[in-house]
C-alpha cells in the first residue's frame, strides 16, 4: 500500500517528494582542495543525471577502530571548509555531530545534522539537533530493529521539528560483518518520513583489517539497486576519486568513475517503483 511521506526542502533539494536524491562525498574532509574538488565533481555528475544532490563529509570521525586512525581536521577547520563548499559549489551540506555541544556550530554551516548510528539512542544529542531547526538525519544503529526508529523520530518531533530523515546502514552479523534486511526500508518508510539507504557503510567490515575497517566495494552497485528497488527516497554513498588513498573508509567507498553509470541505473529503477510508494 502506498505510504504518504512528508516532503520538505533541504537547500534546493526536495526530500520525500517522489524524486530520488543523492547524499554523497568523501567520508572525511581530508583537505580543503580535495573536498572542493569532490563536491564540484559529484555535483556535475548529479546535474547531468538529473539527481538532486546533498554533499556529505565529516570534520571529525570520533568512532575509529584504532587510536592511530586519522580523525580529521577538527570541528573549527572542518566546518570552515564545509561552509566554503556550501557557498562555492552551491550545494546543501550534511555533516555528523557527536555531542550536543557541537550542534550550535555545526548548525550554522550544515543543512543536515546527522546522528551517527552508534549514537542513535542518545536523547540529549538528538533533542539538541532537533532544536537547531536543521534537518536531522538519524542513522539506524547496527544493533537496532527498524521499528524501534519510531522512538528516534519522536525525539525530534517532540521539539517541533518535522524535518526528519531515517537512514539504513546495515546490522551487525557476527564479527566484522554487516548485513542488510531490506524489509527494514519499507518498515521505516511506513512512519511517514523519508528513508535513505546508506549503501557504502552497509558494506563495511568493521575492524576487519585489525587496526582499521575493511569493506566490500565490489558489491556497491548490487546493493544500491536492491535498496532503490525497495522504494527509498534517497541513497547515501561515500565517493572518492582514489579510494586506495582515502584517509577513512576507502575499502567501502565508491570510486568516482563508477558514480555516473550507477546513478543512471538507479534512476531507471526508481522510476519503475515510485508509483508504488
Predicted regions and their residues:
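N-terminal amphipathic alpha-helix/helix-capping segment at the start of soluble metabolic enzymes
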Residues: 1-22, 80, 271-277
Amino acid at each position: 500500500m502506498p505510504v504518504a511521506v512528508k516532503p520538505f526542502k533541504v537547500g534546493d533539494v526536495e526530500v520525500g517528494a517522489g524524486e530520488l536524491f543523492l547524499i554523497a562525498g568523501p567520508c572525511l574532509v581530508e583537505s580543503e582542495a580535495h573536498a572542493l574538488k569532490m563536491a564540484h565533481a559529484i555535483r556535475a555528475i548529479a546535474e547531468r543525471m538529473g539527481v538532486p544532490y546533498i554533499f556529505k563529509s565529516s570534520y571529525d570521525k570520533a568512532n575509529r577502530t584504532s587510536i592511530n586512525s586519522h580523525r580529521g581536521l577538527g570541528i573549527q577547520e572542518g566546518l570552515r571548509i564545509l561552509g566554503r563548499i556550501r557557498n562555492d559549489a552551491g550545494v546543501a551540506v550534511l555533516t555528523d555531530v557527536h555531542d550536543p555541544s557541537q550542534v550550535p556550530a555545526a548548525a550554522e554551516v550544515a543543512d543536515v545534522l546527522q546522528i551517527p548510528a552508534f549514537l542513535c539512542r542518545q536523547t540529549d544529542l538528538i533533542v539538541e539537533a532537533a532544536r537547531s531547526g536543521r534537518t536531522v538525519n538519524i542513522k539506524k544503529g547496527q544493533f537496532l530493529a527498524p521499528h524501534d526508529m519510531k522512538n528516534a523520530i519522536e525525539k525530534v518531533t517532540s521539539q517541533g521539528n518535522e524535518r526528519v530523515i531515517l537512514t539504513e546502514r546495515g546490522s551487525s552479523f557476527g564479527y566484522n560483518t554487516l548485513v542488510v534486511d531490506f524489509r527494514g526500508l519499507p518498515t521505516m518508510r511506513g512512519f511517514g518520513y523519508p528513508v535513505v539507504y546508506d549503501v557504502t557503510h552497509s558494506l563495511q567490515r568493521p575492524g576487519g583489517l585489525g587496526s582499521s575497517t575493511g569493506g566490500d566495494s565490489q558489491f556497491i552497485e548490487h546493493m544500491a539497486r536492491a535498496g532503490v528497488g525497495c522504494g527509498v527516497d534517497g541513497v547515501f554513498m561515500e565517493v572518492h576519486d582514489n579510494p586506495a588513498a582515502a584517509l577513512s573508509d576507502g575499502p567501502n567507498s565508491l570510486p568516482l568513475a563508477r558514480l555516473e553509470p550507477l546513478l543512471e541505473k538507479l534512476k531507471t529503477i526508481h522510476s519503475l517503483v515510485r508509483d508504488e510508494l
